[in-house]
Amino acid sequence: MAVTKLVLVRHGESQWNNENRFTGWYDVDLSEKGRTEAKAAGKLLKDEGFTFDFAYTSVLKRAIHTLWSILDELDQAWLPTEKTWKLNERHYGALQGLDKSETAAKYGDEQVKLWRRGFAITPPALDKSDERFPGHDPRYAKLTDAELPTTESLALTIDRVIPYWEEVIKPRIASGERVIIAAHGNSLRALVKYLDNLNEEEILELNIPTGVPLVYEFDENFKPIKHYYLGNADEIAAKAAAVANQGKAK
């Protein structure tokens, strides 16, 4: 039986992950720790013998720079890459830039958990006059008004990620190419929910750690056989738990 593999990587820790802020579409870079995580992800993939034919990432530098570090470790800096806003992090609306713990202290841990992890719940929306609205950013100049978010739930994130997966990424993998996707916590949660057919309660508890390669294996019918993280299991579990705890009051 032929096994097809796909590698997903959430970007390394960003400056705002480090500061415990809601980031969304705000274009912050990797922290020093994040750069180290990205290089380590590349080394893990190299040690396991992975090479790739094509890469996908978002239009946000924390994901792009993570991919660059990984490909540099693999000596594949030349790899053809497609950048798309459809793999961006979920847009956190008016929460973008706010401290997660302070927001939890104000609104309660449960409300912030729902904003962060609820399936169809959107954070408070931005006004289109707000400088954080993506309509003011030239990288989104070709998007329609309907495509420009003022806030997003995970359900809305799925609405842009999954068609891109089905129409663009999946056919490339099905043709035999080896693909890596470097993206974000929620765009990857959207894809994992779809691939693993998770329900709304299951996805609420799913946390993807930064900078750890997640490998999916598919059968000839493109059904997931299994998935697994590369690296030390205890360290990965601790990183996932840290992600879960970000939205709690101190």
From Swiss-Prot:
EC number of this enzyme: 5.4.2.11
GO MF, one example: phosphoglycerate mutase activity
Binding partners and assembly: Homodimer.
Domain of life: Bacteria
Species whose genome carries this gene: Yersinia enterocolitica serotype O:8 / biotype 1B (strain NCTC 13174 / 8081)
Function: Catalyzes the interconversion of 2-phosphoglycerate and 3-phosphoglycerate.
Top-rank EC class of the record's enzyme: isomerase
Gene field: gpmA
UniProt record, GO biological process: gluconeogenesis; glycolytic process
KW Isomerase (keyword) present: yes
The protein's name: 2,3-bisphosphoglycerate-dependent phosphoglycerate mutase
